[in-house]
Amino acid sequence: MGKRDNRVAYLNPIAAARARGPAPTSGTTIQDYLSRPRPSWEEVKEQLEKKRKGSRALADFEDKMNARWKKELEKNREKVLGGGDKKEKEKEKDKEKEKKEKKKKEKKKSSRHSSSSSSSSSSSDSSSSSSSDAEDDDEKKNLKKKKKRKRSSTRKASDETDSESETDSRESFKKKRKKTDGEKDKDEKDSRKKRKAERSQSESSDESDVDKDADSKKKKHSSEEKEKITDKSKKKKKKKKHKKHSKKKKRKTSSSELD
């Protein structure tokens, strides 16, 4: 038997492509792209000039936005300047008040000095004015003392309420702690009982498993021994049969030889 011929004729792929001819075109080709209509240089210049100038709509939009921004800037400037003017006015008012108070104090001092050097009538007038001033000072002092007492009483009351609230909060916290501790102890006791029960169950199950394994091993051992005994008995029977058969053959051969 000869080998089968599996040879295949070799084809040059380039030669095969030339023989097929040009492939059918689908869509545009490179020649179509190269022969596309192109604008002239003058048209390109016009387009560039239009881009440089920009569109009218964009210019109008920019003008509107600039006008809005100008208005907003003017409003913000007015607000800032108005706020600065108000602050300056307030400062001027404070300065004027201080000046008036200083003038009043100077007048009082001058009136006191003039009362000591003037006549009895003027002294009586000055004494009345000084007594009125002293009364005013006493009233002011009394008012201040009353305010201080009220503040101190309110502070004491607030301190007492705070201390009472603190004691109440401490007592409530202690009670909550005791409750939580008792609950934790109960949970721990329950968990311990459960663990003990689980352990006892696991130990009993392990013992039962051990007993089962021992019984199964004993059964296997007894079954293996029985099989061994049966195998031995079978072998003995076979040996006996073989011996009987060999004796019969020997007898036949001896009888044939005698004949």
From Swiss-Prot:
Domain of life of the source:
Eukaryota
Task: List the coiled-coil residues.
Answer: none
Locate the compositionally biased regions of type Basic residues: 100-112, 142-154, 233-253
Q: What is this protein called?
A: Protein FAM133
- What residue spans carry the Basic and acidic residues bias annotation? 39-49, 59-99, 180-191, 211-232
Gene that this polypeptide is encoded by: fam133
Residue ranges, compositional bias (Low complexity): 113-132
The record, for InterPro entries, names: Fam133 (IPR026766)
Positions of the UniProt region annotated as Disordered = 18-259
Name the family.
Answer: Belongs to the FAM133 family.
